[in-house]
């Protein structure tokens, strides 16, 4: 903890948050007031959000694809092709709703979306960000927990109940919401051959999701159906809901060599070297018949006409994810250290080492937090009991070999931290 001198008559305070000059990095003076760097950052965030809201509400409430993609860029690093496909699909979906409100002889069909990409590539974050910038209700479901109605597990109608709860039981808002179903590859048909055993968590779930995705009036029990059988049901129309499904389709990796050989027989290296570049190129070329071979039924594939592929995140993208987005992990931990009056600094080679560890673990962006937690655990344990520390520096040796970080004290003295017992 930094050594703070006692309050005196000369101590200055922020006029907005009340923090003293010793608790913040900078205190900017005005004619009769002071403002700290934290309040300045908060004001900038408010201005940015208002600017984004203004963009989203242009053109009668339907943002253009470029506007949607621009906002996604602030939260999601890379994945340009997927963001472009999503932006166009979402723009067309909500333009379709505005079109449906007018009298017309032409009825535009709904285009639900399938996101294909490895773990930690940003599928869930993209769906969450879309719902946030469009200001529509959002819910997320795990396909592995779903079963047909009447069997142990979660009924598909519970997805609509969660969306309704997200909309504070406003049925009209819920009917324009976004539903994200994760792990959709886990409900593939177990076998091509008929079986006397009913597939209640595979093909059965696909069949149950069909009507919801194409549009039906679902009877939703507001308190859950199994524990309160006597309650009144709410009628929710799913016709205007946008369904986004995501899956890693990990078992495809073994068959990608055969797919690559069929589609690029002249390139032997493509069949042999399963690099992230090759994998991404194959994912970009996935066709509905590939999904059929994987185990999704034709009717289900037909409800997902828009297919967007996400690539594996490389080292450069992971470094940007660590430091660039608004809620970047480095910024989050930096704020925790600021609460102790200490500045947290990561060197460039430390960020590169963290990104390499995430790639080796094959966890993508999802694994970055656990890596940072293991690196900073000892420091966060010791720091509250230390005096005079102004800065903690994490270098490559700390990130790779779990060495002790460098502590910078008030008079410019730097030394490695002592190993805690």
UniProtKB/Swiss-Prot annotation:
CDD domains: RecA-like_ClpX. NCBIfam families: clpX (TIGR00382), PRK05342.1 (NF003745). One of its GO terms (molecular function) is ATP binding. HAMAP family: ClpX (MF_00175). Component of the ClpX-ClpP complex. Forms a hexameric ring that, in the presence of ATP, binds to fourteen ClpP subunits assembled into a disk-like structure with a central cavity, resembling the structure of eukaryotic proteasomes. The keyword ATP-binding applies. Keywords: ATP-binding, Chaperone, Metal-binding, Nucleotide-binding, Zinc. This is ATP-dependent Clp protease ATP-binding subunit ClpX. One of its GO terms (biological process) is cell division. Pfam families: AAA_2, ClpB_D2-small, zf-C4_ClpX. The keyword Zinc applies. Gene3D superfamilies: 1.10.8.60, ClpX chaperone, C4-type zinc finger domain (6.20.220.10), P-loop containing nucleotide triphosphate hydrolases (3.40.50.300). The gene is clpX. Belongs to the ClpX chaperone family. One of its GO terms (cellular component) is HslUV protease complex. Zn(2+) binds at residues 14, 17, 36, 39. Residues 2-55 form the ClpX-type ZB domain. ATP binds at residues 118-125. ATP-dependent specificity component of the Clp protease. It directs the protease to specific substrates. Can perform chaperone functions in the absence of ClpP.
